[in-house]
Regions:
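Short N-terminal targeting/anchoring amphipathic segment
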Residues: 11, 66-85, 97-103
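A conserved mid-protein helix/loop that constitutes part of the nucleotide-sugar donor-binding site
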Residues: 17-20, 220-234
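Active-site proximal beta-strand in glycosyltransferases
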Residues: 75-76, 92-138
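A short, active-site helix/loop in glycosyltransferases that binds the activated sugar's phosphate group
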Residues: 135-187
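Conserved donor-binding/catalytic core segment of Leloir-type glycosyltransferases
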Residues: 203-223, 242-243, 365
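Nucleotide-activated donor-binding/catalytic signature segment of Leloir-type glycosyltransferases, i.e.
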Residues: 257-276
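Acidic donor-binding loop of glycosyltransferase active sites
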Residues: 284-297
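A charged, aromatic-enriched C-terminal amphipathic alpha-helix characteristic of glycosyltransferases
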Residues: 344-396
Length: 396
């Protein structure tokens, strides 16, 4: 069989905003790719979005369409392995290569195995007033079992793992951490975005003269806002102000409590971003903050972090976050909130100097080099040809 035979790939994703990134990533010589965007809001949807893209509902109607379509492809990529995609894997034929393009939410939001490791002490205390979060995993299992009469998402995911050829992600440390709790498919390095996707052409620099401090990236409880607050109150310089993006987040009661806590302690020095901005407007908002704190204990908000580091913001992460160790391993200057923040407040060192900014820019360019995918692509191509040859030999 010729090594130049076209590889037919199909991509299943739930968020159309990532589609341009994925299409650019798979504009590969010798590959033909098709893309399916899952519609989780409507029923019985099947419509073309272009020559190589279609939108399909995530109900049984759409599931049957996708499973039938998979028969024509060599390899399938599943972006964020939710319940629908896991069930499609479980019901698909044995010859198809399945790759799980990891996001994070499909693990952290579907199981309580990490509950004791991703929340700070002050945030954990809030669970007593947030039953919708404290018992979220139990509620979801009951909902799927009693109401939908379907396996819970984590059950579907676990069953699909044996049929997945590889999990694709670029933070190996995170894969090692999760593997201690859940058996994962073999890991291979891959990133479905490039430098230009994260850092658009013409990106400006952070306003180093500003005294705005960014806290977190959303209204999700994994931001550990309550654990950041005590250290912010130690900043006596009233010229400093604090911005909390709270646009995204599932639990309105948590958001309300965080706003109340911050207002009570910081008064008019704190503002909350709750409205939706265009991407350009959001980037402009980020660049107003020469200091940023992301106290997640797990990978989250990585696009924000990389963008801010490149534009010149001094970023503080939790010492518990695998992203901190990953960035340091790759030579990027990032700081520990629990250790460095108060010292830097006292020494008035909450911003980066120009030399360190340039250093981070160079390292992030290296980190986001798309050519790092080449080894994994070659391995996937080899596996496709092995299976094609096996199928030909079986027929013969």
């Amino acid at each position: 069989m010729s090594a130049k035979e076209t590889i037919n790939s199909i991509h299943l994703l739930s968020d159309v905003k990532f589609l341009p990134w994925i299409k650019r990533t798979f504009a590969l010589q010798g590959w033909s790719s098709y893309y399916i965007v899952l519609n989780h809001k409507e029923k019985k949807v099947c419509k073309d979005l272009g020559d190589d893209t279609m939108e399909v509902s995530s109900d049984s109607f759409g599931e049957s369409i996708i499973i039938e379509k998979l028969r024509s492809y060599d390899i399938a990529f599943h972006y964020l392995l939710n319940n629908t995609k896991a069930e499609i894997i479980n019901k698909s034929g044995a010859d198809l290569i399945h790759c799980w393009c990891f996001y994070g939410a499909e693990i952290y939001q579907q199981t309580n195995l990490f509950r004791n490791t991703i929340y700070g002490p002050q945030t954990r205390k809030m669970f007593w007033t947030l039953p919708e979060k404290r018992f979220r995993y139990e509620f979801r299992q009951w909902y799927y079992f009693f109401w939908k009469r379907e396996p819970s998402p984590i059950s579907s995911l676990r069953r699909s793992i044996s049929k997945i050829y590889a999990i694709l992600w670029y933070v190996e440390e995170e894969m090692e951490m999760i593997s201690q709790k859940i058996k994962l498919p073999p890991w291979k390095f891959f990133q479905f975005f490039s430098f230009d996707d994260i850092i658009p052409a013409g990106t400006g620099n952070t306003d180093i003269r500003s005294k705005k401090i960014l806290i977190g990236n959303s209204a999700t409880i994994e931001n550990n806002h309550a654990d950041v607050l005590p250290l912010l109150t130690a900043i006596s310089d009233k010229e400093y102000s604090f911005s909390l993006p709270l646009t995204y987040g599932q639990f309105s009661r948590y958001k309300s409590q965080i706003k109340s806590k911050y207002k009570r302690k910081l008064g008019e020095r704190v503002t909350f971003l709750e409205g939706h901005l265009s991407l350009e407007e959001y980037y402009s908002f980020l660049r107003k903050h020469p200091t940023a704190v992301f106290l997640h204990y797990r990978q989250q908000g990585l696009g924000n972090i990389l963008y801010l580091l490149y534009t010149g913001t001094k970023v503080y992460l939790s010492q518990h976050n695998v992203v901190y160790r990953w960035l340091k391993k790759n030579g990027i200057e990032v700081f520990i909130f629990e250790v460095d923040f108060l010292r830097d407040v006292q020494e008035q060192q909450l911003t980066l100097d120009q030399k360190m900014i340039q250093h981070n820019q160079e390292k992030i360019r290296d980190l986001l080099d798309h050519q790092r995918n080449d080894i994994t692509i070659a391995e996937l191509e080899a596996e496709v040809y092995v299976r094609k040859n096996r199928k030909v030999n079986d027929i013969a």
